From Swiss-Prot:
GO MF assignments: rRNA binding; structural constituent of ribosome; tRNA binding
Gene that specifies this protein: rpsL
GO cellular component, one term: small ribosomal subunit
Naturally occurring in which organism (per UniProt): Mycobacteroides abscessus (strain ATCC 19977 / DSM 44196 / CCUG 20993 / CIP 104536 / JCM 13569 / NCTC 13031 / TMC 1543 / L948)
Region (Disordered): 105-124
Entry superkingdom: Bacteria
Residue ranges, compositional bias (Basic residues): 108-118
Membership in a protein family: Belongs to the universal ribosomal protein uS12 family.
Name of the protein described by the UniProt record: Small ribosomal subunit protein uS12
Keyword vocabulary terms for this entry: Methylation, Ribonucleoprotein, Ribosomal protein, RNA-binding, rRNA-binding, tRNA-binding
Assembly, per entry: Part of the 30S ribosomal subunit. Contacts proteins S8 and S17. May interact with IF1 in the 30S initiation complex.
Length: 124
């Protein structure tokens, strides 16, 4: 416990908040190459086969990224755009792949929340 005089002389040091998306190096998105595309199972109360990919980013970091939406066309060596955002029931998955950009196609037959999944407006 510092004395009042020590606080007057030096003050208190601010705590530095830990960055949640360190691999993006401060960028909103990063380009990367898929090194492995596979499925994994979620944490305890949930049950599914979640689609994920190991991606080597342009920042030379390899991360695990979630592939959102139903169905995808990704395979090894696909170029993808990665953004921050974790998947709560997949431990260690702190990034998501942006649908509809680079080699990633948008979700087919998507009617609602289309911009999130790179789906074009249907011609009526």
């Amino acid at each position: 416990m510092p004395t009042i005089n020590q606080l007057v002389r030096k003050g208190r040091r601010d705590k530095i908040a830990k960055v949640k998306t360190a691999a993006l190096k401060g960028s909103p998105q990063r380009r990367g190459v898929c090194t492995r595309v596979y499925t994994t199972t979620p944490k305890k109360p949930n049950s599914a086969l979640r689609k994920v990919a190991r991606v080597r980013l342009t920042s030379a970091v390899e991360v695990t990224a979630y592939i959102p939406g139903e169905g995808h066309n990704l395979q090894e060596h696909s170029m993808v755009l990665v953004r921050g955002g974790r998947v709560k029931d997949l431990p260690g998955v702190r990034y998501k792949i942006i649908r509809g950009s680079l080699d990633t196609q948008g979700v087919k037959n998507r009617k609602q929340a289309r911009s999130r999944y790179g789906a074009k407006k249907e011609k009526s």
